[in-house]
């Protein structure tokens, strides 16, 4: 389009679904000549030049570079955290939109925030600036779909149902039934604490109570707002988003509950209206020092490059940090321990290589040391504290070589290699440069496929010449029973189910990186699916 000045993005590329990862700093600026447009981009309605983002504030905002298939609901969702959205005009042919907020103050907050943290829709950066128009007047007969969606959102914001007879598209929002949200965290590569959830969801209203728990091997939470409208806005804005880059995906639904009964204030549950509640009997899920480290390091306000809550100085600081190249995975790499102590091992069977393979499912193992004077115990050093925590959460209590292993955080900060010339009988191995690390490539799909040990294994990198019977025989030879098998359509991947989780663990240890010929080494991981 003539008159559009090319944007310059500074910093680290950021996907649309990153809530706590690196931000992008941009300088959108445009000088559009007068154009005549309607809701579908045809010649009819005249809008005069939209000069520049840092012009006079207006409650009408001009949004550019929208993806072609973006919906009205997605555009409206951009404004919901900042206040009531009162009008919208989609310019489909121009990949642009005008969004009107109820107040100029809300619009200023929105522009300031998105100037520091570039918004994305469908993995595409978009640009938001003030419009020269102080009010958005649209012909509803030409903009019926957008108006229907807006009416639905307005109905939710006022806690009423939509107007009778109003047709709302399938992508439009529906009235909230409950102030309680049910949240499931998929691909939970990094731990998610109660405090992290509180800070993320507090952007949309007062969070009263949170209860976290694990069900069906998935971390879940129930979160209660004071107002159903806040729950609706949070669901609309956050469902499907990632807390961290490429992992920890939020799946949000309304709960059938309308009120949560919280008995204890601890790291699993919290009633923010009752600070007097006891912490409860028993040990917390995390050691208090570790929990504090996670709360500090993963805090939305504390992470350089994080998408902060709606506090503009913090958002600006985040963007500046991203531009300075200081963006990285938030976590406890600074304060958390990277070394695990694994005990109750089968000392007749266990080797550094077998521990490397199993613990390598949950992080990049750097070093392994089986203790010389206590060979049923080992120290395992992971790449960072998040990985050690993840491995501990998933592997503590699992059966390996017939024994239930115990995994705890070690007091050691590193695993020492034996002195040069000293023979430690192969009990210590350095895997720092191993080509088998699953997570050394940033953004790897492996981040999205981390699941607890299960009887079902995911197999990949299968050459065309290998048949189902070949793989069944191969896995049966590990000492277990193959219960089911299913090839994916391209035959490069498959699911294989063993009789027990212990058998699946054994098969993974034995066959991950197995040479199938034709320069194909088998990749094995745990699956959340069943056959």
From Swiss-Prot:
Principal subcellular localization: nucleus
InterPro entries hit by this protein: HnRNP-L/PTB (IPR006536), Nucleotide-bd_a/b_plait_sf (IPR012677), PTBP1-like_RRM2 (IPR021790), PTBP2_RRM1 (IPR035002), PTBP2_RRM3 (IPR034799), PTBP2_RRM4 (IPR034800), RBD_domain_sf (IPR035979), RRM_dom (IPR000504)
Keyword Acetylation included in the entry's annotation: yes
Subcellular location: Nucleus
CDD domains, A to Z: RRM1_PTBP2 (cd12778), RRM2_PTBP2 (cd12783), RRM3_PTBP2 (cd12696), RRM4_PTBP2 (cd12702)
Gene3D superfamilies for the chain: 3.30.70.330
Function of the molecule: RNA-binding protein which binds to intronic polypyrimidine tracts and mediates negative regulation of exons splicing. May antagonize in a tissue-specific manner the ability of NOVA1 to activate exon selection. In addition to its function in pre-mRNA splicing, plays also a role in the regulation of translation.
Modified residues (N-acetylmethionine): 1
GO cellular component, one term: nucleus
The protein's assembly and partners: Monomer. Interacts with NOVA1; the interaction is direct. Identified in a mRNP complex, at least composed of DHX9, DDX3X, ELAVL1, HNRNPU, IGF2BP1, ILF3, PABPC1, PCBP2, PTBP2, STAU1, STAU2, SYNCRIP and YBX1. Part of a ternary complex containing KHSRP and HNRPH1. Interacts with NOVA2; the interaction is direct.
UniProt GO BP: cerebellum development; mRNA splice site recognition; negative regulation of RNA splicing; regulation of neural precursor cell proliferation; regulation of RNA splicing; spinal cord development
List of residues that carry Phosphoserine: 26-27, 308
A Pfam family matched in the record: RRM_1
UniProt GO MF annotations: mRNA binding; RNA binding
Signal peptide residue numbers: none
Keyword Acetylation among record annotations: yes
RRM domain boundaries: 59-133, 181-257, 338-412, 455-529
Superkingdom as given in the UniProt entry: Eukaryota
Keywords: Acetylation, mRNA processing, mRNA splicing, Nucleus, Phosphoprotein, Repeat, RNA-binding
NCBIfam families linked to this entry: hnRNP-L_PTB (TIGR01649)
Distribution of this protein across tissues and organs: Mainly expressed in brain although also detected in other tissues like heart and skeletal muscle. Isoform 1 and isoform 2 are specifically expressed in neuronal tissues. Isoform 3 and isoform 4 are expressed in non-neuronal tissues. Isoform 5 and isoform 6 are truncated forms expressed in non-neuronal tissues.
Name of the protein in its database record: Polypyrimidine tract-binding protein 2
């Amino acid at each position: 389009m003539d008159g559009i000045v090319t944007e310059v993005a500074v910093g680290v590329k950021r996907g649309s679904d990153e809530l706590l990862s690196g931000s992008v700093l941009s300088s959108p600026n445009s000088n559009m000549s007068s154009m005549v447009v309607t809701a579908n981009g045809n010649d009819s309605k005249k809008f005069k030049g939209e000069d520049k983002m840092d012009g006079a504030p207006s409650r009408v905002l001009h949004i550019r570079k929208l993806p072609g298939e973006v919906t009205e609901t997605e555009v409206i969702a951009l404004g919901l955290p900042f206040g009531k959205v009162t009008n919208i005009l989609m310019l489909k042919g121009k990949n642009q939109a005008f969004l009107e907020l109820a107040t100029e103050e809300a619009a200023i907050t929105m522009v300031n925030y998105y100037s520091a943290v570039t918004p994305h829709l469908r993995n595409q950066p978009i640009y938001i600036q003030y419009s020269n128009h102080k009010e958005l007047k649209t012909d509803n007969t030409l903009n019926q779909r957008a108006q229907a969606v807006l009416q639905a959102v307005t109905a939710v914001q006022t806690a009423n149902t939509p107007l009778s007879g109003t047709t709302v598209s399938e992508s439009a929002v529906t009235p909230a039934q409950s102030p309680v949200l049910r949240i499931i965290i998929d691909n939970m590569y990094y731990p998610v604490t109660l405090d992290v959830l509180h800070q993320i969801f507090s952007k949309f209203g007062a969070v009263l109570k949170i209860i976290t728990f694990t069900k069906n091997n998935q971390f879940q939470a129930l979160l209660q707002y004071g107002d159903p409208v806040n729950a609706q806005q949070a669901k609309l804005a956050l469902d499907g988003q990632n807390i961290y880059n490429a992992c920890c995906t939020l799946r949000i639904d309304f709960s059938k509950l309308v009120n949560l009964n919280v008995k204890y204030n601890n790291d699993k549950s919290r009633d923010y209206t009752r600070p007097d509640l006891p912490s409860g009997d028993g040990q917390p899920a995390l050691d208090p020092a570790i929990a504090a480290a996670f709360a500090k390091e993963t805090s939305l306000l504390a992470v350089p490059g994080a998408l902060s809550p709606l506090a503009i100085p913090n958002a600006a600081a985040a963007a500046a940090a991203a531009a300075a190249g200081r963006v990285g995975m938030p976590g406890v790499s600074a304060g958390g321990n990277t070394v695990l102590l694994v005990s109750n091992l089968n000392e007749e069977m266990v080797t550094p290589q077998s521990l490397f393979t199993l613990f390598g499912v949950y992080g990049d193992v750097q070093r392994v040391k089986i203790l010389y004077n206590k060979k049923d115990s080992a120290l395992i050093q992971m790449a960072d504290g998040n990985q050690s925590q993840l491995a501990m959460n998933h592997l503590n209590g699992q059966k390996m070589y017939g024994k239930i292993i115990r995994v705890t955080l070690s007091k050691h900060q590193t695993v020492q290699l034996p002195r040069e010339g000293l023979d430690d009988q192969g009990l210590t191995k350095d895997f720092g440069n191993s080509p088998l690390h699953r997570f050394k490539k940033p953004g790897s799909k492996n981040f999205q496929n981390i699941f607890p040990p299960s009887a079902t294994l995911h197999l990949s990198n299968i050459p065309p010449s290998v048949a189902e019977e070949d793989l069944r025989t191969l896995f049966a030879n590990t000492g277990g029973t193959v219960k089911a098998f299913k090839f994916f359509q391209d035959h490069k991947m498959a699911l294989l189910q063993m009789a027990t989780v212990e058998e699946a663990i054994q098969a993974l240890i034995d066959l991950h990186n197995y040479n199938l010929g034709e320069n194909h080494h088998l990749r094995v991981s745990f699956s959340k699916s069943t056959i």
